[in-house]
Amino acid sequence: MAKITKKQKALAGKVDSNKLYPLADAIGIVKEAATAKFDESIDVAVQLGIDAKKSDQVVRGAVVLPNGTGKTKRVAVFAQGAKAEEAKAAGADIVGMDDLAAMVKAGDMPFDVVIAAPDAMRVVGTLGQILGPRGLMPNPKVGTVTPDVATAVKNAKAGQVQFRVDKAGIVHGTIGRRSFDNDKLQGNLAALIDALVKAKPATSKGVYLRKVAVSSTMGLGVRVDTQTIAAS
């Protein structure tokens, strides 16, 4: 268990768990409490007003964070011919078909994102039991099964993040690192919230953005006033 520092204890005592803080203040508090020796990630949890048990209310998608995530993503692409060349030119780290499938089956997966051209799904489809549990299975809903593999690669490299609501109706994501300027973190969160709003199911009733909280890897969490996000 991580040791709580005196600084974190002092900050925790000042933070009201029931108060909604303006986004700028919330991020400032979280960054101040992020005292680990590494560059902690700044994370967000968004509770949505949906019933995650209903298939027509599953919120899923992808968004390119304008200021990146602070992490360089390694991208693998299943493609052949001209599409393979386009993927390589766009900066894909690994491109292949049957040879790439063999790597996956052998447990050799040195990548964070998998993209596939539509005609490659005959190969990728056999890898579902391996890629699926790792969150790597390409899906057209998040833009990772697409004829435009070059754009998909560029988006992944530029800081695209995928999101999917969990069984409790919460979306978890990372909006950057402690080393990011506050305005960049605010911009990234605003982009994620905008994407979530656009992905709102037609059958969702009542308040959609119920709770938003930001936190760091090892630090405390702070609730955010959603009315201050759009203006950030």
From Swiss-Prot:
It holds the Pfam family Ribosomal_L1. CDD domains: Ribosomal_L1. Keywords: Repressor, Ribonucleoprotein, Ribosomal protein, RNA-binding, rRNA-binding, Translation regulation, tRNA-binding. The keyword rRNA-binding applies. GO terms for biological process: regulation of translation; translation. GO terms for molecular function: rRNA binding; structural constituent of ribosome; tRNA binding. One of its GO terms (cellular component) is cytosolic large ribosomal subunit. Coiled coil: none annotated. InterPro entries: Ribosom_uL1_bac-type, Ribosomal_uL1, Ribosomal_uL1-like, Ribosomal_uL1/biogenesis, Ribosomal_uL1_3-a/b-sand, Ribosomal_uL1_CS. Belongs to the universal ribosomal protein uL1 family. Binds directly to 23S rRNA. The L1 stalk is quite mobile in the ribosome, and is involved in E site tRNA release. Part of the 50S ribosomal subunit. This is Large ribosomal subunit protein uL1. The gene is rplA.
